[in-house]
């Protein structure tokens, strides 16, 4: 079959347009074999290609710009072009394409909309082909399954401008619509418009927002179809908005739970979302975090694998029933005991679930591992599954997740691990149980995902920015990471000392060299289960806050990559550089303020005098925060913590931090204006330092960091069709908004953490449409908890944001909570996703009597126990009609349950 491709693209000298597709004649998706188009004017490019009809009859393709044999630009291809080739080999196609840039409404092309929110589950047939055909294609993703796109025009076949007689288009390739007309029966010139057509009522409801489209008399040969592609149709219909709920899987609680939420409970959560007209269920990371088998493993962002799921999320009932009645009865009793707890007992839950895994694996494992379904899963996931299973086995065998301490296999060798995982080895049963569990988890989550899609609900996942330094990835792919530093965050509303997550930072240069394959595989794996995701700490793709290994707090960190300052540049701001700026400033006059009654003890034990009067330095054995931490290990009394934290503060009291690569270059220490070394400067020096500080942290890096992000994020965010949401909180440089806007990434808007530093509270009516709005995240107190934290701030919110006079109530009443929720639902954001706790807060009967139990995480505490559980079951929640009716009504009133 002859297919002629034509595209209009104005190239520069030395550039050429190439086409790349899914069939051998178009390069078989190999960029090195992309087929060049020809041109006579550098604008109009074409090529006539003979294509053998593929088995499936479908060809996907895209256009690329090449210079010197390398692709320098690629059109938007998250939703690929697709042509359905007719069976008649004598037929030819002539396709007129337009270059596809990233659509302004790119979110509508995501799988969140095409597979769930606006899914067309029952697609119409491919249009009939004619001897002389005219095919018109158009993109219109904002159309739900009750409607279709139709063509109305100045032809009898197109209704002669009667919109109710318009020609319906096929949604076989939704969100692209197509219709083929019999060109032999058309009279040219052809004028037409797209209309929104109600299939049930068989009538048009809206004309597109465009002048008449015009097509002069095209030359169409016999046995040829002319394809007019890449049109876009827009209608004056209300902006699509939706509501959703955010809740960790571990927090879910049903009558069938085993002391912790599981993937079976996720389906029950979807049921509640459907019953209240919510469109999104957002969860936290669900990867395996098992390191010590203690409650410290409860931190969901410190995973040992970016692919493996945590075994505790397995729904035991779905794995099968134990045949031994006595053993089954024992587990039923334990299930009731654990499920009765108000908070998760992480250690007990995992211990008992593992007892069940061993029993059910002994009973069913051999049969499951021999099944065709498992073999298919294993072959598709072997690259990560075998190393993960081996790592987990060796971690328990050697009693440490730190593979550097293992007597064997400390350095990963793929061949050795392949041998270790062979079925004929003595260790195989200990390893194969992980295969078995992951297979079950895969099936259960996939079932929950399918269930959600079928019910028009989006599952939104969470991609952590970091990995554990004691993880499968650090073991198998250490070249991707800088293991001599710690990732974290500078001081913010969550933590005055910054956050130290302990994760290694990424070696972006190595990742760039192989096209970011590590990230691409990670995103693509996630797309198997989720239709939307939150990029945790999206700032990490611009720059990361890296903290030295000898530091505990985040204050001594620096941005990586960054543009450090030389002494000469520092002095150009009017600040005379001194070596003392690099050393902790410890002076007699403030020691009493910091240490109180412990001052003499500190002088005698931890610091020593210098040659300068009343000035001290840290003793060598305590001159880093890690050394201090080691000294106070296990000492948790109030006095020890007082002294320890005071010493941490002394060590971080420096004006500049040396660059991690070049010690002759410097970074101003973050937040130093609150410390004693800054106060010791004279007014002239303070003014000079403030100028330098402001330039460094808020202006200097904008273009530089934008370039860093644009190397990575475009191809990563377009590697799948998931809806992309960014967590852009904290210290946000201007370039973040530029990049997120360019890439159509949804921002996160939180009223009590406004993007404008001049405002105390965000203005809901000014939120960008392309955003997710919420009142609280898992790192924050809930609405009710926040209301009781700072009475003066609450009073200002009550008067200024809610518009009430007088004194604010001491607690957030259900009526006040409903008002706050309603205001958020009325915001401009496309999605309003509230925590389950904030939804429940609106009903005095159903909200938790103890507001303190609702907190999920306290970021300032690196050893926080993540154990929040719903205080009622999902079955009770489904029957909470007073609450559910209120939510349904609010969602409807605020336009977040659109009919079109």
Q: Each predicted region: which residue ranges?
A:
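Extracellular carbohydrate recognition and processing domains
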Residues: 94-107
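Aromatic-rich carbohydrate-binding modules that target alpha-glucans
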Residues: 10-56, 66-87, 140-188, 197-220, ...
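A short, amphipathic beta-strand motif
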Residues: 2-8, 132-139
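Phox homology (PX) phosphoinositide-binding domain
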Residues: 75, 83-88, 93, 97, ...
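Residues in well-ordered beta-strands of folded domains
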Residues: 6, 20, 38, 64, ...
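Catalytic cores of glycan-processing enzymes that make or break glycosidic bonds
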Residues: 107-131, 135, 182-185, 215-900
């Amino acid at each position: 079959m002859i297919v002629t491709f034509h595209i209009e693209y104005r190239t520069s000298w030395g550039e050429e347009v190439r086409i790349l597709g899914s069939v051998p004649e178009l390069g078989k998706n190999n960029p090195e074999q992309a087929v060049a188009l020809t041109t006579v004017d550098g604008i109009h490019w074409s090529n006539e290609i003979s294509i053998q009809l593929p088995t499936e009859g479908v060809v996907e393709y895209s256009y690329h710009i090449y210079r010197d044999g390398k692709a320098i630009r690629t059109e938007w291809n998250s939703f690929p072009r697709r042509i359905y080739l007719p069976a008649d080999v004598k037929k030819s196609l002539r396709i007129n394409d337009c270059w596809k840039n990233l659509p302004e409404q790119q979110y509508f092309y995501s799988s969140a909309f095409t597979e769930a929110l606006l899914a067309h589950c029952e697609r119409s047939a491919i249009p009939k082909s004619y001897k002389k055909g005219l095919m018109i294609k158009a993109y219109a993703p904002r159309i739900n399954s009750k409607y279709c796109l139709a063509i109305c025009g100045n032809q009898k076949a197109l209704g002669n401008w009667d919109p109710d007689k318009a020609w319906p288009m096929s949604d076989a390739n939704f969100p692209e619509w197509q219709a083929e007309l019999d060109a032999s029966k058309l009279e040219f010139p052809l004028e037409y418009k797209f209309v929104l057509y109600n299939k049930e009522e068989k009538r048009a409801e809206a004309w597109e927002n465009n002048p008449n489209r015009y097509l002069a008399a095209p030359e169409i040969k016999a046995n040829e179809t002319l394809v007019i592609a890449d049109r876009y149709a827009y209608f004056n219909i209300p902006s699509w908005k939706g509501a959703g709920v955010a809740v960790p899987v571990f927090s879910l609680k049903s009558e069938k739970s085993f002391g912790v939420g599981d993937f079976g409970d996720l389906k029950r959560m979807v049921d509640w979302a459907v019953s209240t007209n919510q469109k999104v269920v957002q969860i936290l990371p669900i990867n395996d975090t098992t390191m010590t088998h203690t409650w410290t493993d409860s931190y969901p962002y410190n995973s040992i694998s970016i692919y493996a799921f945590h075994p505790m999320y397995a729904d035991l009932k779905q794995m099968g029933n134990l045949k031994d009645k006595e053993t089954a009865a024992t587990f039923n009793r334990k299930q009731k005991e654990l499920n009765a707890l108000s908070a998760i007992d992480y250690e007990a839950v995992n211990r008992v679930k593992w007892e069940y895994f061993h029993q059910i694996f002994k009973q069913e494992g051999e049969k499951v591992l021999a099944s065709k379904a498992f073999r298919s899963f294993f072959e598709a996931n072997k690259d990560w599954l075998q190393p993960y299973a081996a790592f987990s086995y060796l971690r328990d065998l050697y009693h440490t997740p730190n593979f550097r301490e293992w007597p064997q296999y400390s350095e990963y060798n793929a061949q050795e691990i392949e041998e270790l995982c062979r079925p004929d080895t003595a260790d195989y049963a200990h390893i194969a149980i992980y295969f078995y569990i992951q297979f079950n988890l895969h099936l259960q989550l996939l079932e929950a995902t399918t269930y959600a899609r079928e019910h028009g609900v989006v599952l939104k996942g969470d991609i952590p920015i970091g990995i554990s330094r004691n993880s499968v990835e650090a073991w198998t792919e250490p070249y991707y990471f800088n293991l001599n530093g710690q990732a974290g965050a500078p001081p913010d509303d969550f933590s005055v000392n910054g956050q130290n997550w302990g994760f290694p930072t990424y070696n972006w240069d190595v990742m760039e060299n192989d096209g970011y394959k590590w990230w691409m595989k990670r995103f693509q794996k996630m797309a198997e289960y989720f239709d939307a995701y939150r990029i945790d700490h999206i700032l990490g793709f611009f720059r990361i806050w890296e903290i030295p290994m000898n530091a505990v707090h985040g204050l001594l960190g620096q941005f990586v990559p960054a543009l450090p300052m030389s002494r000469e540049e520092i002095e150009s701001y009017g600040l005379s550089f001194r070596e003392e700026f690099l050393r902790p400033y410890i002076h007699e006059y403030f020691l009493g303020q910091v240490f109180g009654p412990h001052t003499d003890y500190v002088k005698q034990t931890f610091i020593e005098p210098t040659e300068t009067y009343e000035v001290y330095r840290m003793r060598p054995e305590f001159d880093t925060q890690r050394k201090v931490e080691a000294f106070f290990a296990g000492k948790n009394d109030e006095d020890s913590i007082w002294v320890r934290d005071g010493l941490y503060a002394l060590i971080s009291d420096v004006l500049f931090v040396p660059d991690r690569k070049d010690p002759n270059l410097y970074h101003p220490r973050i937040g130093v204006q609150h410390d004693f070394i800054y106060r010791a400067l004279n007014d002239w020096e303070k003014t000079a330092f403030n100028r330098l500080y402001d330039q460094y942290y808020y202006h200097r890096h904008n273009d530089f960091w934008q370039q860093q992000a644009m190397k990575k994020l475009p191809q990563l965010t377009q590697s799948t069709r998931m809806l992309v949401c960014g967590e852009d909180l904290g210290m946000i440089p201007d370039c973040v908004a530029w990049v997120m806007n360019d890439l159509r990434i949804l921002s996160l808007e939180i009223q009590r953490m406004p993007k404008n530093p001049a405002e105390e509270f965000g203005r809901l009516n000014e939120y960008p449409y392309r955003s997710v709005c919420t009142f609280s995240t898992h790192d924050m107190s809930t609405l009710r908890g926040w209301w009781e934290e700072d009475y003066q701030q609450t009073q200002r919110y009550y008067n200024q944001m809610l518009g009430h006079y007088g004194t604010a109530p001491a607690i957030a009443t259900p009526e006040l909570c409903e008002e706050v929720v309603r205001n958020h639902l009325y915001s401009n954001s496309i999605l309003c996703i509230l925590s389950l706790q904030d939804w429940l807060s609106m009903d005095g009967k159903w909200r938790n009597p103890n507001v303190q139990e609702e907190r999920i995480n306290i970021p300032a505490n690196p050893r926080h126990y993540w154990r929040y559980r719903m205080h009622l079951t999902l079955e009770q929640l489904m029957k909470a009609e007073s609450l559910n009716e209120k939510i349904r009504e609010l969602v409807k009133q605020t336009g977040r349950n659109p009919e079109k």
